[in-house]
């Protein structure tokens, strides 16, 4: 006789479209954030048009972060995904709003370190969303049943 273990419940996974949309917006957000220090570096090297590009890219980065937040909400509620991306995206949006405000105010003592934190957060988020999904059951604490083949009874 052989035995097999029956899991307590089927795992709930985010729907593929919601996961794809969130991954795409996180990737775009990270790429736009990576461009910011490159653009301001160009300005510091004497390419004065780079400052305008830095400002415009900040706007695109902020809009992308808001779309990322929307994608996180769609992955969470109708998409049956986890809630943590909503909170992570909300944090990124708040940080970018503060970044834009400090940039226009030319408060560089806050603007530069905040930019480093935003890029670090975007990298961590990017790594997290591109990790392969783990098989997790809804009720991970419930013991699995052992079923004996042919008996139809769980033990």
Residue ranges, per PLM feature:
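Polytopic transmembrane helical bundles with strong interfacial aromatic enrichment
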Residues: 2-155
